[in-house]
């Protein structure tokens, strides 16, 4: 074999070995996500589709659940490595009961996506009309639950909180009169509002205590954090890179449209509805307010101590 031919063969072999090594280096992470199709909760899915997590040596296996409390339980049990978009009140309450979980990042600051609505034919037209009515939230301990409790407290309502599961299931229950007031999260249901089928009564921005604090978090379990800290660091970096990409590249909207199956007119509005700064992951905002709301909502009997907070908040950078 000539030297030129040998060089060509060796180069080809190097490419094959390099490709295999790249494939071998992809580390699996199991991630639980609530409310399939949501913009903010879709970071892991979109980053996976856009190749960003792969660039950081990660291959995500994604499980969709109804709401954050389910994903927290999956992380506690060890069947999932990470839970994203879990309600911070549920995370705090679960930790306070001794669960081996750690918060690794903020997922949403404020609640610009959250809203409550009634069918267009309903006599409910303002927040005060919630009195004596059943008002939906997903699952106990979710961010929609904590948000509703804060709304009730702020406006001194006698509303009846009612668990309705997913946003899609809630729409069905609200439109058929099984519950008086539904909850939603943008961009879900906005097409119904534009078509005049539902009336949005209030949003998360109407709840003062939610405006500047973290409402949802990403978390893992102690075992995963201790044994795979470098992996969690790479996850956080890929996650942050994905958020930046979602707000800068039209390709992200294309992926989101395919993922969410939402009408194009809604997909195009999504980045205006949820500002990029609300999805900052490197800090948990409003700790004092988080503690106050968690106590008021009976998620914890008393605020966590500084030592407990130091143990719970483990934002790997």
Which residues fall in each region the model found?
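N-terminal secretory signal peptides that target proteins for export/translocation
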Residues: 1-3
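Sec/Tat signal peptide C-region and signal peptidase I cleavage site
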Residues: 19-25
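Short, glycine-/small- and polar/acidic-enriched structural segments
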Residues: 26-164, 173-176, 180-186, 197-203, ...
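Short, solvent-exposed loop/beta-turn-alpha elements that line the ligand-binding surface or hinge
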Residues: 55, 206-211, 276-285
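Pocket-lining segment of extracytoplasmic ligand-binding domains
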Residues: 168-256
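Conserved C-terminal helix/tail region of periplasmic/extracytoplasmic solute-binding proteins
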Residues: 292-317
């Amino acid at each position: 074999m000539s030297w030129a031919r040998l060089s060509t063969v060796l180069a080809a072999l190097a490419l094959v070995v390099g490709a295999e090594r790249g494939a071998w280096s992809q580390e699996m992470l199991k991630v639980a996500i609530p409310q399939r199709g949501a913009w903010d909760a879709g970071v892991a899915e979109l980053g996976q589709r856009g190749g960003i997590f792969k660039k950081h040596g990660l291959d995500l296996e994604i499980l969709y659940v109804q709401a954050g409390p389910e994903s927290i339980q999956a992380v506690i049990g060890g069947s999932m490595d990470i839970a994203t978009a879990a309600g911070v009140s549920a995370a705090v309450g679960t930790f306070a009961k001794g669960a081996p979980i750690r918060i690794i990042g903020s997922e949403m600051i404020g609640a610009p996506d959250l809203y409550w609505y009634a069918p267009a034919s309903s006599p409910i037209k303002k927040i005060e009309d919630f009195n004596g009515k059943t008002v939906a939230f997903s699952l106990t301990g979710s961010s929609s639950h904590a948000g509703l409790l804060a709304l009730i407290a702020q406006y001194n309502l006698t509303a009846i909180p009612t668990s309705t599961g997913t946003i899609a299931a809630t729409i069905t229950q609200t439109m058929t009169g099984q519950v008086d007031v539904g909850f939603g999260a943008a961009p879900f249901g906005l097409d119904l509002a534009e078509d005049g089928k539902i009336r949005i009564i209030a949003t998360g921005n109407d709840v003062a205590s939610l405006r500047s604090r973290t409402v949802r978090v990403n978390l893992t379990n102690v075992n995963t954090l201790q044994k795979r800290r470098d992996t969690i660091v790479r996850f956080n970096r890929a996650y942050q890179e994905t958020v930046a990409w979602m707000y800068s590249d039209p390709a992200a909207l294309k992926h989101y449209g395919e993922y969410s199956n939402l009408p194009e007119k809604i997909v195009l509005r999504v980045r205006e509805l949820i500002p990029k700064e609300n999805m900052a992951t490197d800090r948990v905002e409003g700790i004092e307010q988080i503690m106050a709301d968690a106590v008021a909502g009976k998620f914890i009997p008393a605020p966590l101590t500084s030592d407990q907070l130091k143990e719970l908040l483990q934002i790997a950078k």
